[in-house]
Amino acid sequence: MSEAIGMIETKGYTGNVEAADAMAKAANVSISKTIAIGGGLITVICRGDVASVKAAVDAGSKAASKVGELVASHVIARPHEEMARAFLGDTNAVKK
């Protein structure tokens, strides 16, 4: 199974929590990490199979937009193992 990483960045905490909740409920993904970037920007990262991550990011983006400010969302299908290690700090971030 090929894994993907999905990211949603919001301005403000409430939108980020709403996004993470919608992501977890919409598809079979795991919420891997949240990152407080600064200036009120927060990113939530999920992982799972490509189709599930795409569905989760779509649902999370819509949910975040309803209660806060969606800044960006993106899905990386089949990320390189080194990239996942560098950005997520997790050697098991991507399963091949």
Give the residues covered by each predicted segment:
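Terminal helix-to-tail segments of small alpha-helical proteins
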Residues: 1-96
